[in-house]
Amino acid sequence: MGSTISPPSGEYLLEMRGINKSFPGVKALDNVNLNVRPHSIHALMGENGAGKSTLLKCLFGIYQKDSGSIVFQGKEVDFHSAKEALENGISMVHQELNLVLQRSVMDNMWLGRYPTKGMFVDQDKMYQDTKAIFDELDIDIDPRARVGTLSVSQMQMIEIAKAFSYNAKIVIMDEPTSSLTEKEVNHLFTIIRKLKERGCGIVYISHKMEEIFQLCDEITILRDGQWIATQPLEGLDMDKIIAMMVGRSLNQRFPDKENKPGDVILEVRHLTSLRQPSIRDVSFDLHKGEILGIAGLVGAKRTDIVETLFGIREKSSGTITLHGKKINNHTANEAINHGFALVTEERRSTGIYAYLDIGFNSLISNIRNYKNKVGLLDNSRMKSDTQWVIDSMRVKTPGHRTQIGSLSGGNQQKVIIGRWLLTQPEILMLDEPTRGIDVGAKFEIYQLIAELAKKGKGIIIISSEMPELLGITDRILVMSNGLVSGIVDTKTTTQNEILRLASLHL
């Protein structure tokens, strides 16, 4: 299915041809191709569940393909482990970094293959070899530093340098910028381009369309386990890529705004967190049926606002007024009782219990309310409410007993939102609600948010994606270094104005 630009044989570093893989009852990959040239950055895109992960697991030998061939540097290969693939020159930098935090940078670089001098590890050689690679890639990190003291972006650099130390010809990067600042992203892109100049083929996986156009030369698109197209980025636009990914044209990235903000339901005045550095003197109003965005650069303390409102952080001063009555949320339970709900930023670590089912994950925030008169859990009500979450949030799942970790990121997020709606909140706060979610699922999340606002919920959204804030909010509160630097009307503001305000107190 689809079309490709096919150069003469031998121009590819990696050729995955006609890869098929089935699981019981599921055709995961159906005749999928991926061809990567040297000196190129190749985007691999598709919605969650399109087959990207399965294809790469077949490449690394984690899954054995049913049929098809893998040709690397002109030779057919069939790896049986990621270690074997790495030793042959194919490396992957995972979204979840794979480093030993308690060990030094150079220990992590050469783990399992330390240079030796006699019976001992040659520390000097390990240091010099690490420093030489870092110098070549313009990485400014002390090889002796403990990894646990470094930023996420620095850890990314170490993973890339480690791949380089194996003389990797193919480097696969899975959502490498998901936790990076703009400055860190630019540095990462510089290093990726250096790898390209040295002849590497980079496979770049990201849901951030702007990055794809900024960085990549070619793109392969998968949908529902099928190969759709491999084409140069030149001549493509965002709408064409989205249409190929989702199988239909998305005429709009954001739903129409049908909500009509009403009376003020939440008044925040001079809110300051006890633990500093954090928020200071934060004031704003939230109206019934309003979607209020919170923007700011990394470190602006956006998350601190919602954590303080939700009782996770203690306030030292200021007032929170709900429907004209002053309240105090000393704990999350108090906040829930006052009608607040918080969808946290880190879905995997603080949002879901990955190995438990949808039922448990749907009900856990409200579990005490399911006890009957004799103190036992009311299974009938629990099953009914779980089904309500699945139906009303439009969760794609075989059933409520399905392990939530097996769902796509978009469907996991729908379950989390549904879980909080069961607490019947008036104020719904969402921190980076579409991070790591594909473009089709993003639109569905936006639709849910718009529907909730239309029903009168007061909604606060924190997002690092400026187009998202401009596309779905009514107003945007801009934070800078813990202070409110402005509140703007979404209809009349610009991205440049928001960035100017975000830099005001740096």
Swiss-Prot record:
Membrane topology value: Peripheral membrane protein
Source domain of life: Bacteria
Gene3D superfamilies listed in its UniProt record: P-loop containing nucleotide triphosphate hydrolases
SUPFAM superfamilies: P-loop containing nucleoside triphosphate hydrolases
Entry's localization field: Cell inner membrane
Regulation: Stimulated 3-fold by galactose and inhibited by vanadate, N-ethylmaleimide, and 5-methoxyindole-2-carboxylic acid.
GO CC list: plasma membrane
Subunit structure: The complex is composed of one ATP-binding protein (MglA), two transmembrane proteins (MglC) and a solute-binding protein (MglB).
Protein name per Swiss-Prot or TrEMBL: Galactose/methyl galactoside import ATP-binding protein MglA
Organism field: Salmonella typhimurium (strain LT2 / SGSC1412 / ATCC 700720)
